[in-house]
């Protein structure tokens, strides 16, 4: 694809992000996307076959970007617990900082369930791998990285969802700190064995 073609495709994706993020998938249309992008409808079909395809492309792109940021946090220098906290905060911040992305991902469940499932499974798999790599010294009950990963990410998702639904409220660092404090105090056996919880 030429540089000009890549720029046009990017313009369409940016327009679709705004349309889907503001109006939702079903209200948005190819014509509203191309109108926002400032291109003809025929141009759209040079890059995407359907409205569903550009939507799925956006969900996959959002997922790659988020996983990349979480991986960067997990691989950064420093203590394991600090890195895991930073990765979880990256996930939490996503839930509260970009309402359009959050809405698009949640709506994917009703547009393409397989893509929606893959989005969360890949995030959880990456986080679980980090937890598993650092599970030495934990009991069998504590060692299941999949349960821990989904549990921690689930907390981040729902605390972030609170901010998404409370439109009058701004994202708060205190929300994240309160959540991490809860995790810390619900995992005394890890500390007792010298293995820090991700706080």
Give short role names for the model-derived ranges:
Residues 93, 125-136, 155-199:
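C-terminal peripheral helix-coil segments that are non-catalytic and often amphipathic
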Residues 48, 55-62, 116:
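Alpha-helical DNA-contacting segments of helix-turn-helix folds
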Residues 38-48:
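Short hydrophobic/aromatic patch on the recognition helix
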Residues 92-114, 158-165:
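Amphipathic alpha-helical segments used for helix-helix packing
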Residues 64-67, 112-137, 146-151, 181:
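Amphipathic alpha-helical packing segments from all-alpha helical-bundle domains
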Residues 57, 71-97, 142, 148-152:
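Hydrophobic alpha-helical connector segments
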Residues 1-23, 29-39, 53:
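Basic, helix-initiating cap at the start of DNA-binding domains
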Residues 22-26, 77, 98:
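Short coil/turn segments at alpha/beta junctions that flank glycine-rich nucleotide-binding fingerprints
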């Amino acid at each position: 694809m030429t540089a000009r073609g890549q720029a046009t495709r990017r313009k369409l994706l940016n327009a679709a992000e705004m349309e889907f993020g503001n109006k939702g998938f079903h209200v948005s249309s190819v014509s509203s996307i191309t109108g926002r992008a400032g291109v003809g409808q025929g141009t759209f079909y040079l890059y995407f076959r359907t409205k569903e395809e550009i939507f799925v492309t956006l969900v996959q792109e959002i997922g790659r970007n988020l996983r990349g940021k979480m991986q960067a946090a997990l691989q950064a220098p420093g203590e394991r617990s600090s890195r895991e906290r930073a990765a979880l905060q990256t996930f939490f911040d996503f839930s509260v900082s970009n309402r359009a992305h959050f809405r698009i991902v949640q709506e994917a469940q009703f547009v393409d369930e397989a893509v929606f499932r893959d989005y969360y499974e890949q995030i959880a798999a990456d986080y679980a791998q980090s937890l598993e790599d650092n599970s030495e010294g934990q009991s069998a009950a504590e060692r299941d990285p999949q349960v821990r990963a989904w549990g921690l990410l689930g907390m981040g998702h729902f605390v972030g969802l609170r901010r998404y639904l409370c439109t009058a409220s701004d994202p708060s660092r205190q929300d994240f700190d309160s959540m991490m404090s809860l995790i810390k105090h619900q995992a005394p056996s890890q500390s007792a064995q010298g293995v820090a919880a991700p706080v």
